[in-house]
Amino acid sequence: MERRDFLKVTVLTGATAALSGCEKPAQKLVRFLPEERLEPGVATWKPSVCTLCPAGCGLLVRVMEGEAEVVRNGQRGLIRMGLAKKLEGNPQHPVNRGKLCTRGQAGLQITYHPDRVRGPLKRSGTRGSGQFQEIEWDEALGEVAQRLKELRSQDRAGTIRFLTGRSRGQRAELVNEFLTALGSPPAIAFDPLDEPVLRQANLLSFGRAAMPSFDLARAGYVLSFGADFLGTWNSPVAQAAGYGEMRQGHPGSRGKLVQLEQRMSQTGANADEWVPVRPGTEGALALGLAHVILRQKLRPAKEDGAAQLIAGWAQGLPDYSPEDVEKKTGVAAKRIERLAREAAEHAPAVAMVGGAPLAHTNGLFTALAVNALNSLLGSVGSAGGMFFTPQPQLTERERRVAAEDQGSGHRLGAALDGAHALLLHNANPVFAAPAAWGMRERLEKIPFIVSFGSFVDETSALADVILPDHSPLESWLDDVPESGTGQALVSLAAPTMSPLHDTRAMPDVLLEVAHRLGGDVGKALPWQNFEERLRVSLPKVTARTKTKELEDEQRSWNEMLEQGGWWSDELEKLASMSGRPASEESAKKFTAAPLAAAQFAAPQFDGAENDFPFQFQPFVSQAFLDGSLAHLPWMQEMPDVLSTVMWGTWVEINPQTAASLGIVQGDLVEVRSQHGKLQAPALVTPANSPGVIAMPMGQGHDNFGRYASGRGANPMAILAPMQVSQTGSLAWAATRVSVSKVGQARLALFSGGLQERPEELKQR
């Protein structure tokens, strides 16, 4: 061999050896036998349930054969199995009828996310350090059962707490049955997307502590007080379908949508008329409209039900003349009179309220005022109006729980302060609650925390043990959607694919822990798994709705699985779903709010106006909602509907406000309240009222996987712990802030965003 050739071989061999030394040790992967018979290249569609927002839409999941790396019996290997490839809406499901929003489409990424917790973990470092070690399920379950057993033996079962996010159906029932068997208090619900103020108002006005549904398809006129019903509020897919029918389903009549708010939402951008209103004065505006209708006798006067809750109603609301309301709201008196006449003359008309108007200190009054306006318009339980989706009958305990905002600061704080053990499922209060509530500090004092999280978020990072749940597509699911349809329904779904990782369903884990505890706890939860519980319990749930179709003999288990649940064949009569006002005696059982003499009080704000001149208005993100979807890359790269911003947070400032502060688009600004400060790029936009600083929720995670962590800022960090009067709910729109330029920033825009209209085109 020539010397030159020898050197070439030597160099190549050495380089190869060096590179191989940098590689990770090869994992031993076995090949498992296929778990099911699938024909290559042929899709199977399986029904499921979307769990990403409160709407509860039905899904169809396209499953095809593929190869995946999985864990079976503690061993990692490769297998040919059915893999979920695409999500679509279930055409038969009464809520979404085949439609699915972008958030629902992104649900697929939860299953295949690279940052999923793949097996049980035990904390190995200091609390909050994020240091965990892998353990076996037997060890993890044994430790949880032993800790709970010790607390029971010490008569401290009452100090065991279970904190959930949005939860309903049999999962919620099972959790509370588990807690009852332990001798512990009911689960605490913490859902930032819930509307507890509206629930309490609906209980007082209609006897139903529930979210309303709307027959938009037959409406002729819609007044929306801050409710982004086409974007993020309530049941957006169902409401968008109804809105589309209102626009295009009646030749010669398109209906009219009027949106009244401070920051233009997706619904506001679609409205025929957008009316900017001073923050916290929407209730006065609703009664100003009612005053005109009563004074001009445009509709028959209503002096019962919801109307009785409003002071001065019987006298024609003398304190709410258009001129007086103009002073409160900034909406011109002539415009108020015109809107009132239009609403009365273009029946059927309906009003709705949600979002920021209910997040002021006077939010309960605002909701009661809009309910009274609906009563006057004749829209309650009528075609083109509002109603309540049929639900299983509630016990008094369930109704009380529904009426209370358990996730409010003082209730949640009081419950956690005395806890010796905390179980967490689908709740992240360290991120989603105001920093002023001190959730991190409270949780750090709890001796034992168990998380069922599929991801290590800010709250799960404080856990002692993580018992990862299956993804929704790998789980048995049931749901009872609360709004969006006039049909009684119960959704049901079997797993659409086998688990990829060494995870277990949260209900199955609770059942296993109950069996390990034995005694009364084991007897109270006799089922071997959640599937068995569903088979036994669903017929009882459906029978409680008292409709003839819901007898369990008429719908077999297999039929429910095939179509994705059970629902009545026909719409119920809307009049039967209108509810009735709560009596004074029954209302006092569920709320401290008065039944009579509700009257406008100016909203209160935290922070002196001289030091903090702007009202701070966080809004629910189109992509991330409250932040629970920020870990999904499809959501990060999706442009915001109005601003077109991607991969970040922004602060919306009106052009007039920005000019007065010397701020231009892209400047890095500091937003400061009495409770903290944050920095984000400025977005100068006419979609925001002067004097209002708006910012999307959802970004600013410290701990939520590679796509969310360290990205943007969290507006909850600077909110004041203000409460909605007489409810205890968080008044998240009651914080004042200051804004100042601190530097330059990069703002990723897909396009130019909204532009201000020429002055001559603006509607007065």
Question: Language-model segments: which ranges?
Answer:
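Acidic/polar loop patches that form or flank catalytic/metal-binding clefts of enzymes
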Residues: 70-72, 84-85, 299-302, 336-337, ...
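N-terminal leader/propeptide and maturation segments of large enzyme subunits in energy/redox metabolism
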Residues: 127-134, 291, 295-331, 496-582, ...
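Conserved short loop/turn motifs at secondary-structure junctions
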Residues: 159-168, 324-331, 354-361, 393-394, ...
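Extracellular/periplasmic catalytic domains that process cell-envelope and extracellular macromolecules
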Residues: 215-217, 343-344, 415-417, 443
